[in-house]
């Protein structure tokens, strides 16, 4: 079983992660593609970044500086799970994983990225902001989806071949998972859905659902899950499996609001 997560917009101010002696940070396998994208992004102005990603002027200026220094600042790279600091990563809580869970996560948890394509948790990355839905024109097309094409799906296929994984658990957002070309992907996909019930209405509450996606990835890693049916035992954040709302491809987890 593989699991995929979205990255986080919010980055840790002081990223830190204690690793066991036999587990070292790794390098992104699609680093050459990230370098190519960074060269394109380096030519963008703060106004361009504001328009493309709808971000503030200070954040745009910060990322202009980051892309300008991207190829000279590799020493600033840190493990992805230490740098990402959003709700999903609050649910994952990589800093509190034991050594065995971290080792398993390094092999089986994948992080989708607009800049790096596909990451392992301990892959060293640099601070950046480049969302997958960004309409950044490259020689491959008008968007990052065009740039990545089937490369992310093929990288997932390669990970599955290396690990023997037979299914992919999609804990990413629609924006990011769209980058995994389903026509090229050789794995069946299971997409857990996290709903909140309040006043008789069931809906996705973004804050809790993002945390639950991270917690689901942690649950998979800690228990070294391979059988999709074992996902049903997930209990975190008040969520519990709801069989009446679920299908094999879309297990639903419900919490009271």
Curated annotation (Swiss-Prot):
GO cellular component: cytosol
InterPro entries: YaaA
SS bond partners: none
A Gene Ontology biological process term: response to hydroperoxide
Top-level taxon in the UniProt lineage: Bacteria
Similarity remark: Belongs to the UPF0246 family.
UniProt xrefs under HAMAP family: UPF0246
NCBIfam families reported for this sequence: PRK02101.1-3 (NF002542)
Descriptive protein name: UPF0246 protein RHOS4_29700
Source organism per UniProt: Cereibacter sphaeroides (strain ATCC 17023 / DSM 158 / JCM 6121 / CCUG 31486 / LMG 2827 / NBRC 12203 / NCIMB 8253 / ATH 2.4.1.)
Taxonomic lineage from the root: Bacteria, Pseudomonadati, Pseudomonadota, Alphaproteobacteria, Rhodobacterales
């Amino acid at each position: 079983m593989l699991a995929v997560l979205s990255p986080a917009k919010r980055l840790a101010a002081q990223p830190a992660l204690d690793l066991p002696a036999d587990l070292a940070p790794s390098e992104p396998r699609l680093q050459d593609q990230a370098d190519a994208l960074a060269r394109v992004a380096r030519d963008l102005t703060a106004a361009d970044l504001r328009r493309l990603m709808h971000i503030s002027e200070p954040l745009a200026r910060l990322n202009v500086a980051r892309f300008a220094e991207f190829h000279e600042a590799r020493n600033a790279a840190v493990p992805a799970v230490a740098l990402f600091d959003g709700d999903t990563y609050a649910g994952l809580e990589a800093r509190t994983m034991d050594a065995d869970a971290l080792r398993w996560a390094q092999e089986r948890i994948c992080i989708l990225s607009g800049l790096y394509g596909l990451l392992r948790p301990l892959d060293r990355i640099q601070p950046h902001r480049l969302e997958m839905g960004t309409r950044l024109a490259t020689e491959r097309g008008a968007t990052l989806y065009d740039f990545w094409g089937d490369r992310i799906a093929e990288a997932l296929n390669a990970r599955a071949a290396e690990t023997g994984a037979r299914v992919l658990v999609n804990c990413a957002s629609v924006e990011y998972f769209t980058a995994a070309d389903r026509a090229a992907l050789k794995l069946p996909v299971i997409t857990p859905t996290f709903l909140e019930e309040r006043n008789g209405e069931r809906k996705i509450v973004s804050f809790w659902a993002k945390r639950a996606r991270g917690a689901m990835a942690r649950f998979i890693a800690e228990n070294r899950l391979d059988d999709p049916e074992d996902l049903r035992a997930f209990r975190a954040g008040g969520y519990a499996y709801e069989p009446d709302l679920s299908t094999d491809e879309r297990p639903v987890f419900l919490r009271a609001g």
